[in-house]
Amino acid sequence: LEDISRQNIENPLITVFSIAENCARQYWKDYPVLQSEKIAIIGFENVGKNILLYGLQVNLIDPGQHFTYHIYGDGTEFRREHTRLDQMAPDEIVFHDSGSYEYAELLDFDRIIICGSESVSSNVTIAGRILAAVPVACPVYLYTPRGDIVTSLFGKGQIICFGTAEKLASADVVFNERTMEAARRQHEFYCQQYGGTPWEQLDSFKRYSNVSSSDYMSTAERLMARGTPPETLAELEHMRWCRYHYIHNWTYGVKTDSARRIHSCLVPYHQLSEEEKVKDIEAIKSRAQDQTL
């Protein structure tokens, strides 16, 4: 079931264990961004695709940010499935479908994520060649279910392993119990304020829109701690909401039509009505309060 996205499962009582989704979710929680970065993702199988998709939704720290994601691997089919990737401004996605790169190019990146294969030896080979060829100063993250073996080869300072089997199993438990529960509470708050469909009757797209928002809360918490005002957090939350819809190929239209994937709120934050802005601000405040309970 690894190729079946959780977001395609309509039954709210069924959860699919996805290594790739868990891995991506846990990676960005463990190694969050603190400022705009130039990021290399080497390898673009399931893990790499999810690293990008989750990164686009949680790496929102400033309305004026500029992240650049360089994808080294064939993204042809991915772009066919996700036709609105050009709507991720102010961030940018650059595809290198051949998967090839000059080692010297890697010196310009702020982080390198190697996730091309589930094979430990393949990813280790890539990492070893990079470290041998150029004096990379940025963090190099290596996807491997056996992090202890890689650490013994390279030492703790040069390679940061993620995606260990033990960590992912633990992350899945946390996701089921905490993230889904937080998403449900968030939706219930919205329903109490504005009305709507009960959680159990939501389709998978809307249910996972709440999950995406709940995933973003760890980023929002860090921004709150730094004194980011609620209005800015609301704008970032709106950017996340738009990205979630664009990832699923929605477009803007004057009149919302869910069946045709058209929504009237797919506009920059400053173009929203004051009523819609208030909804975003109240949602941020409610989630902040929820985290203190």
Language-model region placement:
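Cytosolic regulatory regions of ion transport systems
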Residues: 1-235
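Protein-protein interaction and targeting regions used for scaffolding, dimerization, and localization
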Residues: 184, 188-293
